[in-house]
Amino acid sequence: MLALIGLKDANMIAPHYSLKFPLVNHLPNHELIRMAQSALISRGNLTSKDLIKIGDLLWANDQSSIENMISSIPGDEVVDNALSLNAESRKKFGHYLGGVFVYEGECYWGIDRLPLLEKRLKKLGLKTNDGPNVVQRKHNDIKDIKNLDLEIDVLWSARSPYSYLAMKLLSELSKKYGVKLNYKIILPMVMRGMKVSLEKRTYITKDCKRIADQNDIPFGNIIDPLGYAVERCYSLYA
């Protein structure tokens, strides 16, 4: 289910950043992924063009074209060692997933966090021209707002800092567009038996802090409400 949601999410987000993502309903198979990994490793000093080209071929399910890019197929041990070393580097950087950009100790996961990186680079005076930002999300400001009788189901967790951050923005959205919010409380991940790594907890906290600062939302001095506090909070909705 998570993989399918990720595919749909990528497809919906891409146009807002003037990008394209193929209409696919399944992930590339293991053999194709392995071939793409071999192609990347065999090229040595990778460039962004290499990554884009191999990525396009991967999602197009074009195994033969990927194979043609490999002059000498690396052995399984070489590929496994490279993946292991990179996984260790990712852990040292303080993250736990792919699609992560790291600059001076700060992680940026996914395209929607790249504007934060660009903002940081601009503050350092590294922008070389007066052109528009590289990473811009398209949006339309609707002036004539009509009450369309829409509803949004909000899956809300008392322990999730993202749920906390969303409350202010969702409230503003509801007032501006006449949207009804249906809050549906869910148990925190840990209380559902899921394991949350130190890297994940740390990244989420740091990420929420910068998003909170960006939207003028107080965030800090955290006391974990896990357990009894969450249960007491949810009892209000019983």
Q: What residue spans do the PLM features occupy?
A:
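Short, surface-exposed acidic/glycine-rich loop or hinge patches that mediate macromolecular interfaces
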Residues: 157-161, 227
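Extended cationic-aromatic binding surfaces that line active-site or macromolecule-binding grooves
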Residues: 150-152, 160-161, 180, 188
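C-terminal cap of thioredoxin/glutaredoxin-like
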Residues: 45, 51-143, 151-153, 159, ...
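Structural alpha/beta surface segment adjacent to cysteine/selenocysteine redox centers
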Residues: 1-58, 166-238
